[in-house]
Design a protein with these regions (language model features):
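AMP-forming adenylation/ATP pyrophosphatase catalytic core
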Residues: 1-142
């Protein structure tokens, strides 16, 4: 049993209550139990505050992903920007992007915004059929 908490809209206004933030996944629409007049999706969670932020599907899209705990496979290290394809979800088609070295990992900038890249999930980088490496997503930006 998890402690109940608040559903918030993007402005921070309470729009409902939930049965524990841990039960919800970024991008989730079903099972929220909210009737707000338009479909809403889980756009963020604050585990410390036990809040779940909801909003329109457009809020789920981000272009920039930061990753740490990187494991390079086909290259010894990333020393300069590199054009790659990348995935942030298991069944996702590879997406065009540029990867940049960053402190403790890499910054990945997709050519097109991606739906719900999620901290804690993997970002895997490819060049053709070769897996360059990957890391754990730590944060995302528009």
């Amino acid at each position: 049993h998890y402690p109940a908490g608040d559903f918030l809209d993007r402005s921070g206004k309470v729009v409902g209550t939930h049965s524990g933030a841990v039960r919800y996944t970024l991008g989730q629409r079903k099972g929220l139990g909210l009737a707000l007049g338009a479909p809403v999706y889980v756009c963020g969670k604050d585990m410390q505050a036990n809040t779940v932020t909801v909003g329109p599907e457009s809020e789920l899209f981000d272009r920039i992903v930061y990753a740490e705990d990187v494991n390079w496979i086909a290259i010894p290290a990333l020393t300069e920007p590199l054009r790659v394809t990348a995935r942030t979800r298991y069944h996702q088609a590879e997406q065009q992007a540029t990867v940049y070295p960053a402190e403790n990992g890499f910054r990945l900038e997709f050519d097109q915004p991606q739906r719900a890249p999620t901290p804690g999930q993997a970002a895997v980088l490819y060049q053709g059929d070769v897996v360059l490496g990957g890391g754990t997503i730590t944060r995302v930006e528009k």
